[in-house]
C-alpha cells in the first residue's frame, strides 16, 4: 500500500512540475498561449478543434488574434512559438540570431531534411554554399524560354479535354508541368507533361507533404522518438521514392560527365552540384547526401507548392468569372499588340493566330499578377519552415528564449486588418497599387526565403496566362467549386474538376 501511495505521490509531483514548466513565464516578457496540460500540453486543444472540424491553420489563427500575434504552444515535449506579429517578423528578417533552422527538430523533420542538409534545412556555411551553387546554376539552366515552351506544351496537352468536353482535373497536369520543368533544368531530361513517370513523381511529392504534415506521438515525445522507424515506415516511403530517383540521376551523371573537369560544360544543375561538391572519379557519401537533399528540396517545393498554387488559381478563376474576363481582356489586348507588331515588321506570312504569352508580357497583364498574389494571400500560404533562436533575445518587447522553435504564421498576417482592408474579401485590385504596407511574403522573408521564387512565379504566370488565352474555365455544374482549405505542409484545395471551353479565334483577331 505504501509503495502505491509513493508512486501516486511521485506521479502527482511530476504532473504539477510539468504543468508549471509548460505554463510559467520564464521572463516577464515571455509570450502567452492557451493553458498547457501536463504531459500532453496543447494536444488537448488540438483534438478539441479537430472534433469541431477546425483545422490547424485556423486554430493557430484564432490564437494569434487572442495573443497579440505570438502564441506559445506545447505539443507534448515540443515548445513552439507561432508568430504573426509583424514587428517580430521584421526582427527575424534582420537579426542573424534567427537565420538558422532547427536541424534536429523532430524525427519527421530529420528524415525529410537528411539531418539538416540541403538548401531549406542546413545552416551557416553549409547553407550558403548550397544556396550559392544552386542559384548560380539556376540562372544558367532555368532559362525563360524553357518555362515558355512548357507552358505552351501544357496548353496543348489539355486540348483533348476541351475537344471531347471531358472533365479536366488540374492536379495531375499542374504537377506534370512543374515536374517537366524541374527534370529539364535539374537533370537535362525533356519529359512530356502527361508522362506516366511524372504522374508517379507528383503523387509521391503529394504524399510526402500529406503524410508528414502532422506531428506524430513519436515527434511530440522525445522518449518515443527512437521507435519512429518501426511504426512509421509508410510515412517515409514517398521520401525514399524521390530520393532514390534523385540518386539514380546522380549516378548516371557521374558516369557520363566529361573526362576533363576543367573543360567540362555543365549540362544541368546536377552537373554543377557534382563539380562543386565532388570530382569525376569519386564523391564522398556525405557530399552525395547533400547533393541529393538539395535536389529533394527543390523538387518538393517546385512540384508541390508551385503546382498547388496553379490549382488554387484555376479554382478561383472558375469561381470568379467576372475577374476571369478582366484578365482575358488584358491578354486579348496584349496578343493584339503582338499580332500587329508581327504584321508591321513584315511578318504577314507568320502564323499570327498561334501567338502565346511570354514573360516579356508580364507588365501588360497586371491584373493576372494581382490575381495570383491575392490567391496566394487568401488560400495557399500557411506558415514558414521552422526557424530557431541561437540565444535569448527581446524582439518587439517579447522574450524569445534560446533554442525556441519558431514558425512565421503567414496565414494570420494575411488576414490582419492592419495590413489588408477587408482581409477576408477576395480582391486582387489591392495589389495594383502601393497601398499594402508590408512586402510580399508569399515566398518567405529575408535570406532564408525561397531561392527560386522568381522562377516559381514565372511558372504560375505563364501556365495560367496561356491557359486563359486558349480556354474559358468553367465549373462542371455552373456552381462555385468548394474552396475549403485542406491542411498540409502547404495549404491545398480539395481535388476538383473543371470544364475547358475553347475560345473563338476571334478572341485574338481585330
Swiss-Prot record:
Main location: membrane
GO CC term (a single one): membrane
Protein source organism: Dictyostelium discoideum
Required cofactor names: heme
Sequence similarity: Belongs to the cytochrome P450 family.
Gene (name only): cyp517A2
SUPFAM superfamilies, per database record: Cytochrome P450 (SSF48264)
Subcellular compartments: Membrane
Record-linked PANTHER family: CYTOCHROME P450 307A1-RELATED (PTHR24303:SF31), HEME-BINDING MONOOXYGENASE FAMILY (PTHR24303)
Disulfide bond entries: none
The EC number(s) this enzyme carries: 1.14.-.-
Topological relation to the membrane, as annotated: Single-pass membrane protein
Protein name: Probable cytochrome P450 517A2
Keyword Membrane carried by entry: yes
InterPro entries referenced in this protein's UniProt entry, alphabetically: Cyt_P450, Cyt_P450_CS, Cyt_P450_E_grp-I, Cyt_P450_sf
GO molecular function: heme binding; iron ion binding; monooxygenase activity; oxidoreductase activity, acting on paired donors, with incorporation or reduction of molecular oxygen
Membrane spanning stretches: 1-21
Statement: the UniProt record of this protein carries the keyword Phosphoprotein: no
Keyword terms of this UniProt record: Heme, Iron, Membrane, Metal-binding, Monooxygenase, Oxidoreductase, Transmembrane, Transmembrane helix
Residue sites binding heme per the record: 450
